[in-house]
Amino acid sequence: MDCCTESACSKPDDDILDIPLDDPGANAAAAKIQASFRGHMARKKIKSGECGRKGPGPGGPGGAGGARGGAGGGPSGD
């Protein structure tokens, strides 16, 4: 059974909603959705890159550099 031959798969143009593009609420919602998706893709990319590593990476236990634990300008915690 081919989905493309059925009339249920195709939407008529009447069902498409007309959304005003200058609506501030819609723009804010779109920005949040885009930021969420970009964060998801970044986490997915980082996760796939770390799966192939063995041992601690930079910034991890015994590693050097990174935002934590490196030689930075933050408080020393003494």
UniProtKB/Swiss-Prot annotation:
User: Pfam families from the xrefs?
Assistant: IQ
Q: Which UniProt keywords apply?
A: Acetylation, Calmodulin-binding, Cell projection, Citrullination, Cytoplasm, Disulfide bond, Methylation, Phosphoprotein, Synapse
Residues found modified as Omega-N-methylarginine: R68
Listed as disulfide-bonded, the cysteine pairs are: C3-C51
Q: Tell me where in this chain the PTM Citrulline is found.
A: R68
UniProt superkingdom: Eukaryota
What are its GO biological-process terms? associative learning; positive regulation of long-term synaptic potentiation; postsynaptic modulation of chemical synaptic transmission; telencephalon development
The IQ domain covers 26-47
Q: What is the effect of changing C51G?
A: No oxidant-mediated disulfide bond formation. No effect on in vitro PKC-mediated phosphorylation. No oxidant-mediated disulfide bond formation
Compartments reported by the entry: Cytoplasm; Synapse; Cell projection, Dendritic spine
Q: Which residue stretches does the UniProt record annotate as biased composition, category Gly residues? A: 54-78
N-acetylmethionine (modified residue): where?
M1
What post-translational modification does the entry describe?
Phosphorylated at Ser-36 by PHK and PKC. Phosphorylation prevents interaction with Calmodulin and interrupts several learning- and memory-associated functions.
Sorted alphabetically, the Gene Ontology cellular component annotations on this record are: axon; cytosol; dendrite; dendritic spine head; glutamatergic synapse; mitochondrial membrane; neuronal cell body; postsynapse
Note the effect listed for C9S.
No effect on oxidant-mediated disulfide bond formation nor on in vitro PKC-mediated phosphorylation. No effect on oxidant-mediated disulfide bond formation
Instruction: Please report the stretch or stretches of sequence annotated as the Collagen-like domain.
Output: 48-78
Task: Give me the ranges of the annotated region Disordered.
Answer: 39-78
Q: Which residues carry this modification: Phosphoserine?
A: S36
Q: For the site Crucial for interaction with calmodulin, which positions are given? A: R38
MF terms in GO = calmodulin binding; phosphatidic acid binding; phosphatidylinositol-3,4,5-trisphosphate binding
Sequence similarity: Belongs to the neurogranin family.
Per the record, the domain comment is: Neurogranin is intrinsically unstructured; however, upon binding with CaM, The IQ domain adopts a helical conformation.
Biological role:
Regulates the affinity of calmodulin for calcium. Involved in synaptic plasticity and spatial learning.
**By what name is this protein known?**
Neurogranin
Primary gene name: Nrgn
